[in-house]
Amino acid sequence: MKQIINPLKGNNNKVPIWFMRQAGRYLPEYKKVRETTKNFLDFCYDVSKATEVTLQPIKRYGFDAAIIFSDILVLPHALGWEVDFKENIGPILKQFKSQEDFKYLQINPNYKLEKVYEIIKKVKKELPSPISLIGFAGSPWTVMSYMLEGKGKQDFKTSKKFIYENRILAEELLNFITEKTADHLINQAKSGADILKLFDSWSGVLAEEEFTEFVIEPTKKIILKVKEVFPKTPIIAFPKGAGLLYEKFIKEVPIDVLAVDQMVPLKKMKEWSDKVIVQGNLDPVVLLTNKEIIKEKTYKILQVMKGKNFIFNLGHGILPETPTENVEFLIEYVRLYEEKNSNSTF
């Protein structure tokens, strides 16, 4: 049985481990391949190169899962929306402002998404059988907020003002993205993804009413639509920064796995693991420190989550400046803990 699936099947003696952004800029072998293609989106659609970098962290570290190398913005890009990535700036998008802007969105995605599915098929063929393959998409609110802001990592005043003042239009855009996201995930599962993940990076900026309408409801719709076709495919949801609303999310969304950020108390993770598989939540900055600190912080998580339904991961993506030897040490430490499975320190 695939290692990462074990907790989902009631076998929680193992501690599956993988990292968000495990294929990325902290790896020298990734940088070498990335330098061969100037445009980031072209790199995401390059079947050979995206396959290679997806497999790099598996070959180097032996993670229990590979996550396909792609980006949450390939979906709007494939639907005809203007998306570009500027070096040292990040994503720049055409800004969605009015009903007129729907004319720039296509009903059916173009050939670009087929490249993503080809990458999944190719990785699947090359991936060792015990390793799970994770496909993913951005959750509708996060993708929508990029389109409304025209860029990422803002204070989201533009997005929130838009949904307050243009509720009907905002719901129309949300529903469109929700439908296309579900289709994208279904196609990834058809192509060979064992597990699917929804990244809602900006869910934490919303108040409860908007969180319910723009995070909980579309996530439910997506999961129910995917499960109609692939009822046994586990789905991970990551409503990052949800805070107290994580509990509402767990109660109302039929997820298999809840990914949590580093701000969530371990006591809450343990409590929630009786209801759902919990994934997380080491602070990525810990991996910038030293082995003693890494061991201390990791041990605390492992001890609290011992015997629970748990997948070890970070609270967010691995940072580009992370030393590769620290990643190796952390993985070895988790494996050693798993072997000993005792309360002793080591």
UniProtKB/Swiss-Prot annotation:
One of its GO terms (molecular function) is uroporphyrinogen decarboxylase activity. Substrate binds at residues 21-25, 71, 146, 201, 316. One of its GO terms (cellular component) is cytosol. CDD domains: URO-D. The keyword Cytoplasm applies. Homodimer. Catalyzes the decarboxylation of four acetate groups of uroporphyrinogen-III to yield coproporphyrinogen-III. InterPro entries: UROD/MetE-like_sf, Uroporphyrinogen_deCO2ase_HemE, Uroporphyrinogen_deCOase. It is found in: Cytoplasm. This is Uroporphyrinogen decarboxylase. Its main location: cytoplasm. One of its GO terms (biological process) is protoporphyrinogen IX biosynthetic process. The gene is hemE. It catalyses: uroporphyrinogen III + 4 H(+) = coproporphyrinogen III + 4 CO2. It comes from the Bacteria. Keywords: Cytoplasm, Decarboxylase, Lyase, Porphyrin biosynthesis. Its EC number is 4.1.1.37. NCBIfam families: hemE (TIGR01464). Belongs to the uroporphyrinogen decarboxylase family. The record marks 71 as: Transition state stabilizer.
